Amino acid sequence: MKLAYWMYAGPAHIGTLRVASSFRNVHAIMHAPLGDDYFNVMRSMLERERDFTPVTASIVDRHVLARGSQEKVVENITRKDKEERPDLIVLTPTCTSSILQEDLQNFVDRASIASNSDVILADVNHYRVNELQAADRTLEQVVRYYLDKARRQGTLSQSITEKPSVNIIGMFTLGFHNQHDCKELKRLLQDLGIQVNEVIPEGGSVENLRNLPKAWLNLVPYREVGLMTALYLEKEFGMPYVATTPMGIVGTAEFVRQIQSHINKWAPMFLGKLVDYEPYIDQQTRFISQAAWFSRSIDCQNLTGKKVVVFGDTTHAASMTKILAREMGIHVVCAGTYCKHDADWFKEQVQGYCDEILVTDDHTQVGDMIARIEPAAIFGSQMERHIGKRLDIPCGVISAPVHIQNFPLGYRPFLGYEGTNQIADLVYNSFTLGMEDHLLEMFGGHDTKEVITKSLSTDTDFTWDSESQLELTKIPGFVRAKIKRNTEKFARQNGVAKITVEVMYAAKEALNA
């Protein structure tokens, strides 16, 4: 446990609540103190939906500490069962309930007797896993629970559909452009003549989970959530899965080819022939998606060799690194992720596409790395956007966690062929163009907070005299910040408090020596 004012991945109970509130007619009860119940506000603010967030906080207060929680928790479960009549109630433990060492499973067993709804306890260890790991585990737990229930009742679907069909696993609330990505995936699958059997958890019903084995295969577009469920379905029902993320021209083509190879195992029996999606890939790449053409245009060639930093969750950071390096010829100096639990996979994916790899959940390390590298642009999360503003470096947001700007009302997918167009736009618009630099130089731009050290520390005790300031304005804008930083570094090393023109030249000589 650590105190931080910024976390890339939240505590475990947030992941569980995200999965529970993504399903239709599922209610979550969180056993937590006041302050842990910010999820309702966060989801209501960010997800632009009309429905209320189906989460109730069972508050741990002084009465609970004195008498125990059982009576209160059981009462909350039975009350919500009568009021909302959900299909499922998920009791979510928190760090506080773990510290109190209460037997929440016993509370669930007691409440189940008096409830018409199914009641389960989210099986996550709050001191071992973060938000994304907990979401993955909770989704697998819910799927396992309902498939076991269907098996006991004899209602489990054993036969597969006549036409090729898939389950899309891992689309859920507060995800990065998840709803747009889901629409784009459905459109791509429709073009290929593939039916969508179930989408879980976003908008799915727990009563329909028994239909999951009907599909020919499962699609897991994001590694963070859905992989455990896909592995469980593969083990129990022999269902293959595709975990390649269809981001970028190359990634989407690979995704479609993997689907083709799995479908062709059943196609001769059900369709009487093999399927061939190569003409579709060729048509989309050459004529529908603008990204392949754009990457060969003079506009994109101006970006060749530009230095960038990429940071985010494993799925988006790895895919973005490969798109920038492989499809656009942009130099990725450092690629990083905050998903420490999946570091090995990430390193394997980006190896050879970048100079450095950073795996950390400490935003100060990320900030110091960006300040050291001084890239032309950053591609990261909301935190990297803040860092970019401090350092006056443009940033394109490509990964959660994000703020309201990245829950757009318009159609902005990142997956599929339409996603390639969005990514190309984002990349191009994230760079400050040369002419823009000159125009800002001539006519002035917005006031900016310039950062002049190699870290995000704000301590500085230097004064520049009028002559040195005038000399600084004569230096071209694209190197001015770097020269200012190097001069102050020289002054700091030599104990100089006031910077003059002589100090500037001395710093230049020392640097060239």
Swiss-Prot record:
CDD domains: Pchlide_reductase_B. One of its GO terms (biological process) is light-independent chlorophyll biosynthetic process. Its cofactor is [4Fe-4S] cluster. The keyword Glycoprotein does not apply. It is an enzyme of class 1 (oxidoreductase). InterPro entries: ChlB/BchB/BchZ (IPR050152), LI-POR_suB-like_C (IPR013580), Nase/OxRdtase_comp1 (IPR000510), P-CP_red_C (IPR042298), Protochl_reductB (IPR005969), Protochlorophyllide_Rdtase (IPR016209). Pathway: Porphyrin-containing compound metabolism; chlorophyll biosynthesis (light-independent). Keywords: 4Fe-4S, ATP-binding, Chlorophyll biosynthesis, Chloroplast, Iron, Iron-sulfur, Metal-binding, Nucleotide-binding, Oxidoreductase, Photosynthesis, Plastid. GO terms for cellular component: chloroplast. Binds 1 [4Fe-4S] cluster per heterodimer. The cluster is bound at the heterodimer interface by residues from both subunits. [4Fe-4S] cluster binds at D36. The active site is at D299. Component of the dark-operative protochlorophyllide reductase (DPOR) that uses Mg-ATP and reduced ferredoxin to reduce ring D of protochlorophyllide (Pchlide) to form chlorophyllide a (Chlide). This reaction is light-independent. The NB-protein (ChlN-ChlB) is the catalytic component of the complex. Protochlorophyllide reductase is composed of three subunits; ChlL, ChlN and ChlB. Forms a heterotetramer of two ChlB and two ChlN subunits. This is Light-independent protochlorophyllide reductase subunit B. It comes from Zygnema circumcarinatum (Green alga).
